Amino acid sequence: MAGAKEIKTKIASVKNTQKITSAMEMVAASKMRRAQDRMTASRPYAESMRKVIGHVAQGSLEYKHPYLEVREAKRVGYIVVASDRGLCGGLNVNLFKKVVSDVKNWKAQGVEVEFCPIGARSVQFFKAFGGKVQAHASGLGDAPKLADLIGTVRVMLQAYNEGKLDRLYVVFNKFVNTMTQTPVIEQLLPLPKSEDDEIAHHWDYIYEQDPKDLLDTLLVRYVESQVYQGVVENIASEQAARMVAMKAATDNAGTLIDDLQLVYNKARQAAITQELSEIVSGAAAV
């Protein structure tokens, strides 16, 4: 059994760690609330864009934009959004597992795969993974702006325009609630059709004046908005996962302190008993 002094030092060390994890939990909770506000504010725009584009994909246009045409899948691109920092449980690991599983399915069909990682952890993973990285972005902070992503996203759009990609997906952790964050893979290009069949079959848009000019701008903005929404969703998910992970670490530290305190008390009691035995033995010898 370790000595009482050694155990006491370990208890002090664990208490210091507990203070750090508790502080990180509170910081993550505060950041999560702000991230949730940004996510909630941007969701209606992203969802409205998705509905509009879904109707466009269903509509019968004289001008058929390249983003509406379904090509044979020979090359697939993934924009993978992960966190810049760790200490957020299995958030990034679960996301990467989902991507790798999807990539294996494509490669089994002889399809080439390229990546655009967003977030330091994503960049680090896919460079080690050995995939072809077309573009990347990291260090976006807790309150990223759309302008921070446009350059990176347009590299992938350019590759799609040039026929170097036939499918484009965005991957991120969707924020469900504080305890649940779900990794999702959403198709960006070619444009997915609206799932709302009832509305799609009852009306269509009238384009004035030239649908080409409008769609060229609208469809690019759509892709950018969906990637941005994925980033803000992932930030909210990251902070929620970190808050939960730090709470678990704080609770575990408390349990460890209690266990160490019990060991310390036993060691101290054993030391006192040993001293008393030595005193009694010495007195008997005299």
Curated annotation (Swiss-Prot):
Where in or outside the cell it occurs: the entry states: Cell inner membrane
Specify whether Membrane is a keyword of the entry.
yes
Query: InterPro entries, alphabetically?
Result: ATP_synth_F1_ATPase_gsu, ATP_synth_F1_gsu, ATP_synth_F1_gsu_CS
Supply the PANTHER family for this chain. ATP SYNTHASE GAMMA CHAIN, ATP SYNTHASE SUBUNIT GAMMA, MITOCHONDRIAL
Return the PROSITE patterns for the record. ATPASE_GAMMA (PS00153)
Family, according to the entry, reads as follows: Belongs to the ATPase gamma chain family.
Q: Which Pfam families match?
A: ATP-synt (PF00231)
Query: What's in the keyword line of the UniProt record?
Result: ATP synthesis, Cell inner membrane, Cell membrane, CF(1), Hydrogen ion transport, Ion transport, Membrane, Transport
Major subcellular location class: membrane
Q: How does it assemble?
A: F-type ATPases have 2 components, CF(1) - the catalytic core - and CF(0) - the membrane proton channel. CF(1) has five subunits: alpha(3), beta(3), gamma(1), delta(1), epsilon(1). CF(0) has three main subunits: a, b and c.
- NCBIfam families attached here? ATPsyn_F1gamma, PRK05621.1-1
Q: Name one GO cellular component term.
A: plasma membrane
Output one GO MF annotation: proton-transporting ATP synthase activity, rotational mechanism
Q: What is this protein called?
A: ATP synthase gamma chain
Where does this protein come from, organism-wise? Shewanella amazonensis (strain ATCC BAA-1098 / SB2B)
Q: What kind of membrane protein is this, topologically?
A: Peripheral membrane protein
What's a single GO BP term from this record?
A: proton motive force-driven plasma membrane ATP synthesis
What is the stated purpose of this protein? Produces ATP from ADP in the presence of a proton gradient across the membrane. The gamma chain is believed to be important in regulating ATPase activity and the flow of protons through the CF(0) complex.
